[in-house]
C-alpha cells in the first residue's frame, strides 16, 4: 500500500470516528452528563466540517473509487445530527413526557427521508427546507429551557420543514 493510499484510508477512518463520537455521546446522555455530551456533539461537527477538505486533499475518490465516502458521510451525519439529538431531547426531558416518544419519532422519520433526497440542496449549495441540524435545535432548547409544549411545537414545525 502506498503512502497516498494509506492517507486516503486514514481520511475515511477520520470520518468514521464520527460513529464512535455519536455512540459515546449517547452513553453520556444516558448518564445525564449533558455538558460533556454537548462537547462531543461539537467534536462531531468539527469532524464533519473538516473531513471533506481532507478527502479532497487526499484525493480519496480517485484513490479508493470502490468505497463510497459520501454514503459513509451520510450515515455518520444521520447519527450525529438526528439520532443523538433525538436521544438528547428524550433524556433531557425537554418534551412533554406523555408525547416525547412520538415527538422524537418525527425528526427521525422526516430526516431519514430528507437525507435520501437527491435534490437536498440548491445550485448554490443552500439546503431546501430545514437541513436536519437537530443538534443545534437540541442545544437551544436546552439552553433556553423553554416550556415543553413550545419545544414540542418547535420539533413538529421543523420536522414538517425537512
Enumerate the predicted regions with their spans:
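Membrane-interface loop-to-helix entry segments
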Residues: 10-16, 75, 127-137
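Helix-coil boundary and interhelical linker segments in multi-pass alpha-helical membrane proteins
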Residues: 24-40, 75, 79, 83-105, ...
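Multi-pass membrane catalytic core of lipid/isoprenoid biosynthesis enzymes
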Residues: 11-16, 57-114
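Alpha-helical transmembrane segments and their membrane-interface exit regions
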Residues: 45-50, 107-115, 156-162
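C-terminal ends of transmembrane helices
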Residues: 54-62, 112-125, 162
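C-terminal membrane-associated helical module and adjoining short loops/tails
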Residues: 124-162
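Topogenic membrane-insertion module of multi-pass membrane proteins
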Residues: 1-52
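Cytosolic, membrane-interface loops and tails of multi-pass inner-membrane proteins
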Residues: 1-2, 50-69, 128
Amino acid at each position: 500500500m502506498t503512502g497516498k493510499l494509506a492517507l486516503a484510508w486514514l481520511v475515511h477512518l477520520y470520518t468514521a470516528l464520527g460513529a464512535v463520537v455519536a455512540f459515546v455521546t449517547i452513553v453520556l446522555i444516558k448518564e445525564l452528563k449533558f455538558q460533556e455530551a454537548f462537547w462531543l456533539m461539537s467534536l462531531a461537527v468539527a469532524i464533519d466540517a473538516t473531513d471533506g477538505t481532507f478527502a479532497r486533499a487526499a484525493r480519496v475518490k480517485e484513490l479508493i473509487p470502490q468505497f463510497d465516502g459520501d454514503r459513509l458521510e451520510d450515515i455518520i451525519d444521520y447519527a450525529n445530527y438526528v439520532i443523538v439529538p433525538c436521544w438528547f431531547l428524550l433524556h433531557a426531558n425537554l418534551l412533554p413526557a406523555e408525547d416525547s416518544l412520538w415527538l422524537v419519532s418525527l425528526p427521525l422519520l422526516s430526516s431519514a427521508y430528507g437525507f435520501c433526497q437527491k435534490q437536498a440542496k440548491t445550485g448554490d449549495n443552500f439546503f431546501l427546507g430545514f437541513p436536519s441540524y437537530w443538534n443545534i435545535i437540541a442545544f437551544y432548547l436546552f439552553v433556553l429551557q423553554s416550556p415543553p409544549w413550545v419545544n414540542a411545537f418547535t420539533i413538529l414545525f421543523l420536522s414538517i420543514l425537512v
